[in-house]
Amino acid sequence: MCSDPNVYKNKYMENSNLNIQTILQSARSGAAIYDSSDWGKILVSDRDRLRFLHNQSTADFEKRLAGEGCDTVFVTSTARTIDLATGLILDDEVLLLCSPNRREYLFNWLDRYIFFADRVKLKDVTDTLASFTLMGDESAGILAQLGCPITDLPQHSHQVYIIDGVEVRIAIGTELGLPGYRLICDRDKSATLHQSITNLGAAIVDEDAWECLRIAQGRPKPDAELTEDYNPLEVGLWDTISFAKGCYIGQETIARLNTYRGVKQYLWGVKLAGSVAVGATITVDGEKVGVLTSCSQIDGGILGLGYVRSKAGGVGLKVMVGDVEGEIINIPFVRHEYPV
């Protein structure tokens, strides 16, 4: 028996990291499933639902038809980020999928903007609906084996299928930008659905592995990359923004930043030579150029996310993060090119 608790701790961490690497590989080139049931789910209904969401977020909801969907960013009146969400357009409702730590905040924020003449209703259905993310290159094959052959459909398009007696809404795409699908069903049927998928070999993604994937892909998270310190253009969420739809909350600031090429900092990945605390200052030649917002051990190294001043440089820039050497790298989920 080992008398030194640190030896046991280090051995446990090695085994844990090895397991996470196996899960990460499955999520990319194989198949893996993540239980996202605690992510917020808000039903927006009644006559003005599309116009309401159109006016409250960055995406063009009024052009969307039932069976379609889109990512959108909810921002403050000064275009500071609240959350990155997905809207699935149903026949008579819109199902908003939002971050777990923004569920209550976003519901109350939306409710505050429903005025007397608006025909809009909100309902939090997080506790009645389960959701899963099935990801990886082999995820389509698993769904095909379950009787759901899905091919060549647009991102976020969705429809209802039956899997082992369970009614499941399957949407194209994942929260991470990896190949895969989001699956939504009644909570009381979720165990059956989960078992059907894992029986076909999908690895289970736990919260630690999910956080590693999130950082590696560069998906921003509320209270880390999405805060009132940053706007959607700094985050790199250009594809969630309609520049042609007219007024919405925060639109004036976003339009001005785009028109005058005024984005002063960008979210990047940071490849680190060692561990460093979140919140550490990013410097170049002793001058502060940014801040580290997330960090984890991934793919045998340390990766982080952080904001860096645009004038300092981008991919390939050598930096110090605290007292640790680092290099700015690209992250797949975001982009930083102004539209043509």
Q: Which residues does each predicted region cover?
A:
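Residue-level signal for inorganic ion chemistry
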Residues: 46, 96, 134-136, 183, ...
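Short amphipathic alpha-helix segments
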Residues: 74, 149-162, 275-287
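Acidic, proline/glycine-enriched N-terminal capping motif
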Residues: 2-82, 88-89
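Short, solvent-exposed amphipathic alpha-helical segments in soluble enzyme
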Residues: 57-62, 110-116, 148, 197-202, ...
